[in-house]
Regions:
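Stable alpha-helical elements in mature extracytoplasmic
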Residues: 19-30, 108-115, 139
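Solvent-exposed, flexible loop/coil residues
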Residues: 7-9, 108-110, 136
Length: 143
Protein backbone atom coordinates (compact mmCIF):
# COMPACT_ATOMS: atom_id res chain seq x y z
CA UNK A 1 0.00 0.00 0.00
CA UNK A 2 1.20 3.49 -0.74
CA UNK A 3 0.19 5.89 1.99
CA UNK A 4 1.61 7.35 5.21
CA UNK A 5 4.57 9.04 3.56
CA UNK A 6 6.32 11.57 5.71
CA UNK A 7 9.73 12.98 5.08
CA UNK A 8 11.10 15.44 7.58
CA UNK A 9 14.07 17.63 6.88
CA UNK A 10 14.81 20.31 9.42
CA UNK A 11 14.89 23.13 6.84
CA UNK A 12 12.40 21.62 4.41
CA UNK A 13 9.66 19.60 6.11
CA UNK A 14 7.13 17.72 3.99
CA UNK A 15 3.70 17.32 5.52
CA UNK A 16 1.92 15.48 2.72
CA UNK A 17 0.14 12.18 3.27
CA UNK A 18 1.10 10.34 0.08
CA UNK A 19 2.60 12.50 -2.70
CA UNK A 20 1.78 11.35 -6.22
CA UNK A 21 5.44 11.33 -7.24
CA UNK A 22 6.25 9.07 -4.28
CA UNK A 23 3.40 6.68 -5.16
CA UNK A 24 4.74 6.33 -8.71
CA UNK A 25 8.35 5.94 -7.49
CA UNK A 26 7.29 3.23 -5.03
CA UNK A 27 5.44 1.26 -7.69
CA UNK A 28 8.30 1.69 -10.18
CA UNK A 29 10.72 0.39 -7.55
CA UNK A 30 8.84 -2.90 -7.29
CA UNK A 31 7.85 -3.30 -10.94
CA UNK A 32 10.45 -3.80 -13.66
CA UNK A 33 8.45 -3.48 -16.89
CA UNK A 34 11.15 -5.35 -18.83
CA UNK A 35 10.53 -8.43 -16.66
CA UNK A 36 7.62 -10.63 -17.78
CA UNK A 37 6.82 -11.52 -14.17
CA UNK A 38 6.16 -7.82 -13.47
CA UNK A 39 2.58 -8.34 -14.65
CA UNK A 40 2.00 -10.69 -11.72
CA UNK A 41 3.49 -8.19 -9.29
CA UNK A 42 1.43 -5.27 -10.61
CA UNK A 43 -1.79 -7.18 -9.95
CA UNK A 44 -0.86 -7.39 -6.27
CA UNK A 45 -0.07 -3.71 -5.73
CA UNK A 46 -2.72 -1.44 -4.21
CA UNK A 47 -2.62 2.32 -3.89
CA UNK A 48 -3.56 3.10 -0.31
CA UNK A 49 -6.06 5.92 0.08
CA UNK A 50 -6.46 7.28 3.61
CA UNK A 51 -9.79 8.85 4.51
CA UNK A 52 -8.16 10.81 7.31
CA UNK A 53 -5.51 13.45 7.76
CA UNK A 54 -2.54 13.96 10.05
CA UNK A 55 -1.37 16.55 12.50
CA UNK A 56 2.38 17.20 12.64
CA UNK A 57 4.16 19.09 15.38
CA UNK A 58 6.51 21.46 13.61
CA UNK A 59 9.37 20.43 15.89
CA UNK A 60 8.91 16.68 15.38
CA UNK A 61 9.95 14.22 12.72
CA UNK A 62 6.74 12.19 12.84
CA UNK A 63 2.97 12.73 12.88
CA UNK A 64 1.52 13.59 16.28
CA UNK A 65 -1.93 12.23 15.49
CA UNK A 66 -4.63 11.24 13.04
CA UNK A 67 -7.24 13.85 12.07
CA UNK A 68 -10.78 12.51 11.61
CA UNK A 69 -13.66 14.16 9.73
CA UNK A 70 -15.22 15.51 12.93
CA UNK A 71 -11.90 17.01 14.03
CA UNK A 72 -11.39 18.48 10.57
CA UNK A 73 -14.83 20.14 10.77
CA UNK A 74 -13.65 21.92 13.93
CA UNK A 75 -10.47 22.97 12.13
CA UNK A 76 -12.54 24.38 9.26
CA UNK A 77 -14.40 26.50 11.81
CA UNK A 78 -11.03 27.85 12.94
CA UNK A 79 -10.21 28.74 9.34
CA UNK A 80 -13.54 30.55 8.91
CA UNK A 81 -12.76 32.55 12.06
CA UNK A 82 -9.27 33.39 10.72
CA UNK A 83 -7.59 31.48 13.56
CA UNK A 84 -5.36 29.44 11.22
CA UNK A 85 -3.46 29.88 7.97
CA UNK A 86 -4.79 27.59 5.28
CA UNK A 87 -4.14 26.63 1.71
CA UNK A 88 -5.10 23.78 -0.54
CA UNK A 89 -2.36 22.00 -2.39
CA UNK A 90 -4.18 21.33 -5.65
CA UNK A 91 -1.41 19.25 -7.22
CA UNK A 92 -1.69 16.67 -4.43
CA UNK A 93 -5.33 17.29 -3.55
CA UNK A 94 -4.74 18.06 0.12
CA UNK A 95 -5.71 20.77 2.54
CA UNK A 96 -2.71 22.07 4.50
CA UNK A 97 -3.47 24.07 7.65
CA UNK A 98 -0.94 25.84 9.87
CA UNK A 99 -2.27 26.18 13.43
CA UNK A 100 0.92 27.70 14.84
CA UNK A 101 2.58 24.74 16.56
CA UNK A 102 1.13 22.12 14.20
CA UNK A 103 0.61 21.59 10.50
CA UNK A 104 -2.45 19.56 9.56
CA UNK A 105 -3.15 17.85 6.27
CA UNK A 106 -6.46 16.39 5.14
CA UNK A 107 -7.49 14.90 1.79
CA UNK A 108 -9.75 16.75 -0.63
CA UNK A 109 -12.04 14.99 -3.09
CA UNK A 110 -9.32 15.61 -5.71
CA UNK A 111 -6.89 13.60 -3.56
CA UNK A 112 -9.08 10.52 -4.11
CA UNK A 113 -9.70 11.25 -7.80
CA UNK A 114 -5.97 11.61 -8.55
CA UNK A 115 -5.14 8.29 -6.90
CA UNK A 116 -7.93 6.51 -8.75
CA UNK A 117 -6.52 7.92 -12.01
CA UNK A 118 -3.01 6.67 -11.14
CA UNK A 119 -4.36 3.22 -10.34
CA UNK A 120 -5.92 3.00 -13.81
CA UNK A 121 -2.94 4.62 -15.54
CA UNK A 122 -0.43 2.19 -14.01
CA UNK A 123 -2.77 -0.79 -14.43
CA UNK A 124 -2.16 -2.09 -10.92
CA UNK A 125 -4.29 -4.33 -8.70
CA UNK A 126 -6.47 -1.50 -7.43
CA UNK A 127 -6.86 0.62 -4.34
CA UNK A 128 -7.24 0.07 -0.63
CA UNK A 129 -9.18 2.50 1.55
CA UNK A 130 -8.05 3.11 5.10
CA UNK A 131 -10.33 4.47 7.83
CA UNK A 132 -13.62 4.61 5.91
CA UNK A 133 -15.58 5.42 9.08
CA UNK A 134 -13.59 8.57 9.79
CA UNK A 135 -13.73 10.25 6.39
CA UNK A 136 -15.94 13.02 5.12
CA UNK A 137 -18.78 11.85 2.89
CA UNK A 138 -17.42 13.94 0.01
CA UNK A 139 -14.41 11.61 -0.14
CA UNK A 140 -16.66 8.77 -1.34
CA UNK A 141 -18.09 10.78 -4.28
CA UNK A 142 -15.33 9.80 -6.78
CA UNK A 143 -16.41 6.16 -6.47
Amino acid sequence: MTYDYHQYQRNNPNYYTAPISWIKETIDFYVDESDESAKNIKNKILIGIPFHGYSFQKSSSSPSGVVTASQFSQILSGIENNEFDYFSYEEEGEYIIDTGNNVINYPMKEFIEKRLEISKELNIGGIGIWDVGNGKESLIEPF
